Amino acid sequence: MAKKSAIEKNNRRKKMTKNAAPKRARLKAIIADKSKPMEERFAATLKLAEMPRNSSATRIRNRCDLTGRPRSVYRLNKLSRIAIRDLGSRGLVLGLVKSSW
């Protein structure tokens, strides 16, 4: 089980990213628009740089919903390989069968 502080930090980042997403998108659109004057694009770059780092989507870590494990998490069901194996051995994952040959 992951540290609760790490899980909470990631949850705060998710919330901050969700709140700041429209503003970040607006500023990035201004920066990418070559028809705007250079001064306006530069001002948008400075405003984007002033925003908190944790409001960026790249700072979010994919974590297992059950254990909080940060590595080897499947995006499809947001579970780590270990959690999938445990649930599968108990028969709780539909369609998952232990392989044998």
Swiss-Prot record:
Keyword Ribosomal protein carried by entry: yes
GO CC aspect terms: cytoplasm; small ribosomal subunit
Keyword Cell membrane tagged: no
Keywords carried by this UniProt record: Ribonucleoprotein, Ribosomal protein, RNA-binding, rRNA-binding
Function: Binds 16S rRNA, required for the assembly of 30S particles and may also be responsible for determining the conformation of the 16S rRNA at the A site.
Entries under NCBIfam families matching the protein: PRK08881.1
Name used for this protein in its record: Small ribosomal subunit protein uS14
Species the sequence originates in: Rhodopseudomonas palustris (strain ATCC BAA-98 / CGA009)
